[in-house]
């Protein structure tokens, strides 16, 4: 694969606030690359620099061989953005929203009509083409935003938390469409706080916290390296931790306390689970390790506001 985006020692500052703190990464053409992190981690600031709507404070950022400076129209024409906010004109129909947006890319009207019809079919909104925006569900609005992002046939698609607030059915439909775009050769850049979404869609991810990259890699590899394959959750009083760790620690590759729960991480859970059965502890859960475990281990389990 060819590298399509390269960041080297990238900074973004807003006055005295450092939102992006010297990060470096590469995104390969045709992959889905995810930025994960809690609120304020620097995900959106990074995305805005890639999309040339926010200037780079320091460092270098190259997109498709060009510097990503503010208002680089050449790069903007190669990029489609699915925003987190619903930015559709409520006075227009679904079809009219797409037709109006096509003018920003100087798409000839005849070509735009054909393209709009294709995209409404792609996002399963043909039957809603003449509906006003307020007549659409939230899931339909988000699918229309996907269609809008594809009008200019972009090489790079930025999806900024594309399924926020959606029910599971709508979320899975959007995942299907994003996977289809990737199969067609698009490079996807995803920001999300849904760990399952990142596992479903991303070839590689970075986990950001306080403007820095903590880890980078394939979701499955990060889970194996940071957590193992299985997790035991034991809801038990903290004053019993020492005794329990003494009995179970040899079977685990790590442990931590969070709130009312003691977590044990292991690569082979059979021995740990046999011991737990012997101890017959109440309030115990044994499950596969997930990307959420990695995320919480690296960024902390305390509430971040």
What are these model-predicted stretches?
Residues 175-267:
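ABC transporter nucleotide-binding domain
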Residues 1-11, 301-305:
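ABC-family P-loop ATPase nucleotide-binding domain
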Residues 76, 120, 223, 273, ...:
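Conserved protein kinase catalytic domain
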